[in-house]
C-alpha cells in the first residue's frame, strides 16, 4: 500500500487540500521522498519543493489551502501551495523536524535541536516570530519498543496542537519520568501528569472538541493507552495488553457535524 518503509503520522499519506480541488502526497522517486500536489482526478502532478535535493516528509497544507510545510534533509520549509516563495526556517540547529500547522493556520509547530536532543519551536506562517516554546529537559524525543516486533527500534514522540490552537501538548523529562505537559503560546507551562517513578508517557493526541487527550503510558514495562479529561485531569485506561505487546499512536475517530 505504500513505498515508504517507515510508516508514521509524519511520513504523511494522501491528504485533501482545503478547497477540495487538489490532493497532497509524498511519492518516493529514485529513493527520495518528494512533496507533491495533484488534481483530484490524479492529473497535473507537481513537485512543490522547487527542485529541492533533499528527502522531504512531515508534509502538510495549511487549513486555508494556500501554503504547505515540510522538512527536507531535516530543515523546515514553507512555501505557497504551488511551490513558489519557498522559505527556509533557519533555527541554527542541524535537526528540524515534523512541522505541523496550527488549527488557524497562523503558526507552525516543529521540533528543533540535534538528533535525540530537541525541543518544540513555533514560527509564524510568514517565517517571523521564531521561538523555542518549551524545554524537554533532556528527553530524547522518541519511545523505544524493542520488545515489540517492528522494523525500527523507536517512534518519534513529537508535540501536538490543542484543538483551539492556543497551546501545545508535549512530553518531557521530570526526574526519572517522562510526563505530559501543556504550554501556551506565551510560554506558560502546566504539568498534566504526576506519576510513580519510572513512568513514561508518549504520543499526546488531543480530542477535536478540546475536552480530552489520548496518550500512551508505559507503566510496569507495558505500553497502554489512556484518556484524560482536561478539566480535572482524571484518566481512564483504554487498553489492557499483556507483556510483549504495546499500544502506540492513538487517533480520534472523526464525527460528522451533520445530523
Report residues per predicted region.
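Sequence signature of WD/YWTD-type beta-propeller architectures
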Residues: 1-259
Amino acid at each position: 500500500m505504500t513505498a515508504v518503509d517507515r510508516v508514521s503520522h509524519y511520513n504523511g499519506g494522501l491528504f485533501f487540500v482545503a478547497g477540495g480541488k487538489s490532493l497532497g502526497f509524498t511519492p518516493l522517486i529514485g529513493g527520495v521522498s518528494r512533496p507533491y500536489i495533484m488534481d483530484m482526478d490524479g492529473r497535473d502532478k507537481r513537485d512543490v519543493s522547487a527542485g529541492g535535493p533533499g528527502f522531504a516528509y512531515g508534509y502538510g497544507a495549511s487549513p486555508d489551502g494556500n501554503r504547505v510545510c515540510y522538512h527536507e534533509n531535516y530543515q523546515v520549509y514553507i512555501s505557497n501551495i504551488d511551490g513558489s516563495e519557498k522559505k527556509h526556517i533557519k533555527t541554527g540547529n542541524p535537526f528540524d523536524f515534523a512541522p505541523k500547522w496550527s488549527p488557524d493556520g497562523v503558526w507552525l509547530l516543529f521540533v528543533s535541536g540535534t538528533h535525540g536532543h530537541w525541543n518544540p519551536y513555533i514560527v509564524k506562517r510568514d517565517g517571523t516570530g521564531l521561538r523555542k516554546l518549551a524545554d524537554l529537559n533532556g528527553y530524547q524525543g522518541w519511545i523505544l519498543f524493542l520488545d515489540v516486533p517492528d522494523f525500527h527500534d523507536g517512534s518519534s514522540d513529537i508535540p501536538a496542537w490543542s484543538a483551539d490552537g492556543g497551546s501545545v501538548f508535549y512530553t518531557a523529562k521530570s526526574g526519572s519520568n517522562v510526563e505530559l505537559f501543556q504550554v501556551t503560546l506565551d510560554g506558560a507551562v502546566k504539568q498534566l501528569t504526576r506519576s510513580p517513578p519510572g513512568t513514561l508517557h508518549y504520543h499526546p493526541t488531543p480530542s477535536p472538541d478540546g475536552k480530552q487527550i489520548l496518550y500512551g503510558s508505559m507503566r510496569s514495562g507495558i505500553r497502554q493507552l489512556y484518556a484524560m479529561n482536561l478539566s480535572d485531569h482524571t484518566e481512564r485506561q483504554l487498553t489492557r495488553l499483556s507483556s510483549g505487546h504495546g499500544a502506540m499512536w492513538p487517533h480520534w475517530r472523526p464525527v460528522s457535524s451533520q445530523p
